[in-house]
């Protein structure tokens, strides 16, 4: 119901925009979506959801990993295209395998199989850069320390559960522009923060 209310709000109040993909979007500025996790899990009921994939992706985020081999080994395909695109760019194969062509799809499946089976290949080609896992569990501070935001949240929930400062940020502002403009990793996290 809350998700459907959000969609209705966007349709009724949203502004149509053209953005970088030229697909077009309708959006509203800052809609706060609140969910009481004591009562239910916020899973969409309006379409089929690959719940195993959702669970594996969340566990992957929480480990701090940015190499998607674990996801590929567990049948989660949502991140495959990002690594494959990096591979094509760095090996000058973009023209040989035009995006979404039949050849591209066949070669990407071969690429994923190699990732699953070859440790060295996986280490070289399947790191997405400083996305969710790194930002959540190994945020790089100015002084070089790594900050584990998930551990901080867990500690605060045990010791100061009424604090307004219990939140996780997925956007390290020192890296955002680099993530946006560089093509050698995934783009910035979609979910910028949660509280």
Describe the role of every protein-language-model region.
Residues 1-195:
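Terminal, non-catalytic protein-protein interaction segments that mediate quaternary/complex assembly
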